[in-house]
Design a protein with these regions (language model features):
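Replication-associated primase and helicase/ATPase modules
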Residues: 1-4, 15
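Short consensus segments that form the blades of beta-propeller domains
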Residues: 21-24
């Protein structure tokens, strides 16, 4: 267990909230808590006011986990926003483009009776942190650490307690009587979470997310070589007027794509029977292992400029990224996969069959269109692609007016992740229950942290018509992963 947790008392908690026909507000009528690594009985409070009274009576720094903080945390934030005693731990930011921009105070800079929270611009809830009575109370989302439904947690970790099913009957409200059956159900949920968290934390898996746990362990395995192999690409400056980006990280990130999901045209809204579903077991670790033969980029890139593909980029121990400008048309018998984001001319989620666009002046779709300025523009688009996607692009599409603008290449290595993967592969094969589940989590969640960028944009909560509302703040202060 890390030193951080030695200084804190950890709890698992859960709210039950009102659900009834015709309701116009939702309240907490049960708040259950259990202390980790302790045989102390669980406690149940009958309102959110009673819950905070209990929390404030506990000594020392506290970490309190809820399984899905986005739900339970909304009641906590609502309570804080409606309590004038507690103020936001933030400073205004002088930003002409964001009138209400703020920056969160660090823990050491927080004043008494203040709070802050981490909610991403995409609505992902991570923490709510309070400073009260000269100590910190942090509410965390255990769903980010243990990414399963609570019913699945019980099965995966083989906990002694199992999640029960129960439908509440009758009207519930803060302070209402709780039956013995309801109390058993409420406590059981917390016991399941408590047991799973004890397993995770006892094994040292105590970061905010499972991805962070994986990344931290991999860094420990690599030692000092990690910082040589995986340099911060956002600190590798390049001339924007020459390469279209300010840093190597920005340049490479433009090539980053999510998974491919496509419905073949003509097959929508039809029923097909006797279909086939295919899956690849442990796809990420199998591709990261040296057994796959895959080589991965390391270090800093070498750039080239001009309408050619550098011979150095094509060597066996290299991986390259390329920026091109072209018009394109899908070849017969091939599936589309190119998406163009950030342009009003294209739907960002559509896999395009061509770069042609609709021209309002002519009423037709073609290679040229009339802009708002009244001038004729061509539809040559700029794309940044990995060498893997570039080769696939040339295979799937015809190209016209094609031009290579520039590119960069990296040295590559094989077996970078073998020590990490072999460790958890062995545990997975030789273990059952919680240890096997943990091994699967660690095998499948390392990759994502390497893809993170500097975007740390977040949401700020406020009350609107007696309900929570949010506005976004743009920020780019997060430490990035190694995107290549």
């Amino acid at each position: 267990m890390s030193n951080e947790y030695n200084k804190q008392t950890i709890y698992a908690a859960d709210f039950e909230t009102t659900v009834y026909k015709g309701q116009n507000r939702t309240d907490v009528w049960s708040a259950c808590m259990g202390k980790l690594f302790s045989d102390d009985p669980l406690t149940i409070d009958h309102s959110i006011d009673d819950f905070f009274e209990r929390v404030f009576s506990l000594p020392g720094n506290l970490v309190i986990y809820f399984h899905n903080l986005k739900f339970d945390g909304s009641f906590i934030l609502d309570w804080l926003l409606n309590n004038p005693k507690f103020k936001l731990a933030a400073d205004p930011v002088d930003d002409d483009e964001q009138e209400l921009a703020i920056s969160w105070k660090k823990n050491k800079g927080m004043y008494e009776n203040t709070y802050k929270y981490a909610i991403s611009d995409r609505g992902m809830w991570y923490t709510i942190t309070m400073k009260q009575n000269r100590r910190f109370i942090e509410f965390r989302d255990s769903l980010k650490l243990i990414p399963f439904k609570l019913s699945e947690v019980a099965d995966a970790f083989k906990t002694e307690h199992k999640k029960l099913d129960m439908k509440y009957e009758g009207f519930r409200y803060p302070g209402c009587r709780i039956t013995e059956q309801e109390e058993e159900y409420i406590k059981n949920d917390v016991y399941v979470l408590k047991e799973a968290l004890e397993i995770m934390i006892s094994d040292g898996h105590d970061k905010l997310t499972i991805g962070s746990c994986c990344y931290a362990e991999y860094k420990e395995i690599c030692g000092k070589s990690f910082y040589y192999l995986f340099t911060d690409q956002y600190r590798v400056n390049i001339p924007c007027e020459k390469y279209g980006s300010n840093t190597a990280g920005d340049y490479v990130h433009a090539s980053y794509k999510g998974g491919w999901c496509y419905l073949v045209k003509g097959k929508e809204e039809k029923i097909f029977e006797k279909g086939l579903t295919a899956d690849v077991n442990s796809l990420y670790p199998s591709m990261m292992s040296s057994e796959s033969g895959n080589r991965y980029p390391v270090g800093n890139p070498t750039f080239w400029k001009g309408n050619y593909l550098s011979e150095n980029a094509l060597k066996n121990n290299r991986y390259y990224f390329i920026r091109i400008k072209t018009r394109f048309y899908l070849k017969p018998g091939y599936l589309p996969f190119i998406q163009i984001k950030g342009s009003h001319l294209y739907t960002p989620t559509e896999c395009l069959e061509s770069s042609d666009v609709y021209d309002r002046a002519s009423g037709e779709k073609g290679a040229f269109y009339t802009g708002l300025d009244g001038k004729i523009h061509d539809t040559r688009v700029e794309l940044t692609l990995t060498c893997t996607d570039y080769e696939l692009f040339r295979e799937h599409y015809y190209v016209y007016d094609f031009e290579i603008l520039d590119g960069c290449y990296y040295e590559t290595r094989i077996g970078l992740f073998d020590d990490y993967i072999e460790k958890y592969k062995k545990i997975k094969l030789e273990s059952k229950g919680a240890k096997r589940t943990l091994a699967k989590l660690y095998l499948n969640n390392l990759y994502g942290k390497f893809a993170s960028n500097t975007d740390s944009s977040f949401k700020v909560a406020y009350l609107k018509n007696d309900a929570l509302a949010f506005y976004p703040v743009d920020e780019h202060l997060k430490r990035p992963g190694y995107i290549p």
